[in-house]
Amino acid sequence: MISVSGAVKRMWLLLAIVVVAVVGGLGIYRLHSIFGVHEQPTVMVKPDFDVPLFNPKRVTYEVFGPAKTAKIAYLDPDARVHRLDSVSLPWSVTVETTLPAVSVNLMAQSNADVISCRIIVNGAVKDERSETSPRALTSCQVSSG
């Protein structure tokens, strides 16, 4: 059988923590009532306004050259990869985005000795490259256009 004094010896630390917590809680409660924290605060909130969208960006990808067809892969403004095989040249596609910045990429390869690519953002040519080699491969890239 466990004696009462043995139980007190084992539980004194837990008992001390409980007493300190209760005394501290009562003290904080009294301070809150003295400084009026229990009153409901008045908060003035401005009406919610819609965040204006960024000016839309029109991104145009173009591939051209003497070949009749080409393999094309491009990364759109939403970071989705599009792969197209045997596309008739000249080729172009335009996408629109409201992202504040665009990072796009275009790669093209043909069976001819020359191929060119171009990326246009809002009417301005941001990158244009041409490659001359057997089975020509070229790429264009725009970051934060």
From Swiss-Prot:
Keyword Membrane: yes
TM region(s), chain numbering: 11-31
Membrane topology designation: Single-pass membrane protein
Keyword vocabulary terms for this entry: Cell membrane, Membrane, Transmembrane, Transmembrane helix
Any one cellular-component term (Gene Ontology): plasma membrane
Compartments reported by the entry: Cell membrane
Keyword Transmembrane: yes
Induction data: Transcriptionally regulated by MmpR5.
InterPro entries: MmpS, MmpS_C
Pfam families named among the record's database cross-references: Mycobact_memb
Domain of life, per lineage: Bacteria
Family: Belongs to the MmpS family.
Protein name: Probable transport accessory protein MmpS2
Species of origin: Mycobacterium tuberculosis (strain ATCC 25618 / H37Rv)
Taxon lineage: Bacteria, Bacillati, Actinomycetota, Actinomycetes, Mycobacteriales
